[in-house]
Amino acid sequence: MKGRKIFRAVAVSLVLMVLFACCGCSGLRQERYSSSFFDTFDTLVTVYGYAKDATEFNEYMGIAHSRFIELHELFDIYNNYEGVNNIKTINDNAGVEPVKVSREIIDLLLEAKRLYAETGGKVNVAMGSVLSIWHDYRESGLAEPELAELPPYDMLEQAGLHTDLDQVIIDEQTGTVYIEDALLRLDVGAIAKGYACQLVKQELVEAGFESFVISAGGNVCTSGEPAEEGQTSWLIGIQNPDTQAAAEIVDTIEVRDKSVVTVGGYQRYYTVNGERYHHIIDGDTLMPANYYESVTVIADDSGVADFLSTTLFLMPLDEGKALAGEMGVDAMWIFKDGTFDNTDGYRQYSAYYMASS
């Protein structure tokens, strides 16, 4: 419950027992492999998994990497790619014409609209006009810290007039997306990476890969159970949002066929006059949310977990707990003072509570 300190919690070695276990344990038919790449979604993506040999694992990695590249290009809001209509293409044609897009983009936007409606509208993928202002000021502030400044609030307010998700018209029959408001911009950063992880997981399972973890920044997506004797769950460490603390991990959770997503203001920010301003912007205030240091969500679906982690970060604890219950997910909130709170269901996954019971 809130008020209890968590930094006594869990040794890093507990995480390493599974995530860095030796390959080819005696008597097992499968060995553990891992591989990473850093060319998609602006983050390091690592796949840990069990396969009969390196050739088989590399085949699965080829599927994962190529699919992540494809989804990265489709969901990108900053860059054009030859022969690809992506989110940027939709934005560039706002108020001009509908854009023919892939099924993946259609489904992503439909899911974002569904979750927006079901969760009170705290996370809005039509807020790109506001988020782009914060992005530009943050990038400038990081490049020249001595000149860092906040965006003028009247600029944010003007951009905030162009965030109506109903202005994003999705036509499934024609496979097009059209933004009616010429000044509205899409930004799918609150769901795209988790959604991509879920798609890649499903396609790897369909290809025959059964026991693996995809780790993409704060998104961890698990499939099956570790092919290690005596192991029935994956052990996932939750990062300490206090990056100066001695303990890098504040809790370890045991999950199987679940996704774990953590968001926090410590991950991407810049400093103005000694104050940190992170990238998670509240659509009501047009300013960074200030309730928590981080929020972790455990859910069946990685895209849902991604979206809900940001949603819960943007609302008070009582509202967040109620929403988590309605959505059938579990969560843990870490506050500015290092205390924490969680849903009751979170305890079944937590090494902290297991050690305390």
What do these predicted regions represent?
Residues 2-357:
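Mature catalytic core of soluble alpha/beta enzymes
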